[in-house]
A protein has these predicted regions:
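C-terminal boundary and immediately downstream tail of ABC-type ATPase nucleotide-binding domains
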Residues: 217, 221-244
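ABC family nucleotide-binding domain
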Residues: 1-220
Length: 244
């Protein structure tokens, strides 16, 4: 589903991604973790070309993201992306946020888009908030609407860029529960997160990044209990004992 080959990304003289090669198979849940500034968010944002790469190739759903002539809108339509900051349209209701793209990009008729959106809002536990505007929703509710909106395009792949980082701690669980449900349903997902308990419970594989490189790839049990790379070992020690 996702193939990343020899990808490099620069910000001026700063080498943000260094020769990254990785793949995510259909139905696989891959969690990307690491310290701040390690390149996690940059990597996931290159997958749907929110960030452009300097070299290498990225292929999603059989489409080369960086090939000349790639229709970027059509390419992105096959990838759901959930941001840190929700990015809902403030002047649209929860329902309207979930119907806009299917109607404009997929040509869905309004009644069909409405029916689909209501089903998705129900799936994330927010059918009762269909007519609410984002300003009337909590952060956790806004992020669940954002997930429903991403699902409205029926993407085979979902990307999450630290989806709980902007939430109050008590709101985190409701968003992670929705994501866990997607994993159970077989959605292909690539997730950047600091929620290590979630990664342990849901991921098929964990990628650990630091300084623009993937330093370790492992099953969750191996990564959390038997990390091989010294930097991963230090990272896990630090998050387990933050005041020592």
């Amino acid at each position: 589903m996702i193939e990343i080959q020899n990808v490099n990304k620069w910000y001026g003289s700063y080498h943000a991604l260094i020769d990254i090669t990785e793949s995510v198979g259909a139905g696989e849940v891959v969690v990307v973790c690491g310290p701040s500034g390690s390149g996690k968010s940059t990597l996931i944002r290159t997958v749907n070309r929110l960030e452009e790469i300097a070299s290498g190739t990225i292929t999603v759903n059989g489409q080369n993201a960086n090939a000349p002539g790639t229709d970027i809108n059509r390419f992105r339509a096959g990838i759901g992306f959930v941001f840190q900051q929700f990015n809902l349209f403030p002047h649209l209701t929860a329902l309207e946020n979930c119907t806009l793209a299917p109607m404009q990009l997929r040509g869905l008729k309004k009644p069909d888009a409405h029916e689909q959106a209501m089903a998705l809002l129900d799936r994330v536990g927010l059918a009762a908030k269909a007519d609410a505007y984002p300003s009337a929703l909590s952060g956790g509710q806004q992020q669940r609407v954002a997930i429903a909106r991403a699902l409205a395009m029926s993407p085979p792949v979902m990307l999450f860029d630290e989806p709980t980082s902007a939430l109050d701690p008590e709101m985190v669980g409701e968003v992670l529960t929705v994501m866990q449900g997607l994993a159970r349903d077989g959605m292909t997902m690539m997730i950047v997160t600091h929620e290590m308990g979630f990664a342990r419970a849901v991921a098929d594989r964990v990628l650990f990044m630091d300084q623009g490189r993937i330093l370790e790839r492992a099953a969750p049990d191996d990564f959390f209990n038997r990390p091989q790379h010294a930097r991963a070992q230090q990272f896990l020690r630090d998050i387990r004992t933050p005041f020592n």
